């Protein structure tokens, strides 16, 4: 199945690789705050990605483009499939960190 999404990756000290000193609980808290700001219109998803994401996709506002679900870790693909197009799902935890996912296709 092909999916299209944008995401914000929030790293934490137990992620692979551990590129941040915060714990997973704080990363989840930051994710919830960002989702709230984005949904209230106070911050665009693209701006939040550029300012907060640990993924190189931040340069594209978090845009991952189209991908086969098998190309992503199972946690990410499963979460993405449960999000309606143009919506943002709840924070998703994977070995890479905490993801904020917006399904775009």
Positions of predicted regions on the chain:
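Short acidic-hydrophobic surface loop/beta-edge motif
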Residues: 88-94
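Cell-wall glycan
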Residues: 6-7, 74-85
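Signal for well-folded cores of large energy- and translation-related assemblies
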Residues: 39, 53, 81-84
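Well-structured core secondary-structure elements of compact alpha/beta domains
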Residues: 1-40, 56-71, 101-105
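Phosphate-coordinating loops and pocket residues in cytosolic domains that bind phosphorylated ligands
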Residues: 10, 50, 82
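Glycine-centered tight-turn and secondary-structure capping sites
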Residues: 41-46, 86
């Amino acid at each position: 199945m092909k999916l299209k999404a944008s995401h914000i990756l929030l790293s934490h000290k137990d992620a692979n690789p551990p590129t941040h000193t915060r714990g997973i609980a704080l990363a989840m808290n930051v994710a919830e705050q960002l989702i709230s700001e984005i949904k209230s219109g106070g911050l665009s998803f693209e701006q939040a990605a550029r300012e907060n994401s640990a993924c190189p996709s931040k340069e594209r506002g978090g845009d991952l483009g189209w991908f086969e679900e098998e190309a992503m870790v199972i946690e990410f693909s499963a979460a993405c499939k449960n999000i309606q197009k143009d919506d943002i799902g709840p924070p998703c935890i994977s070995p890479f960190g905490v993801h904020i996912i917006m399904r775009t296709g």
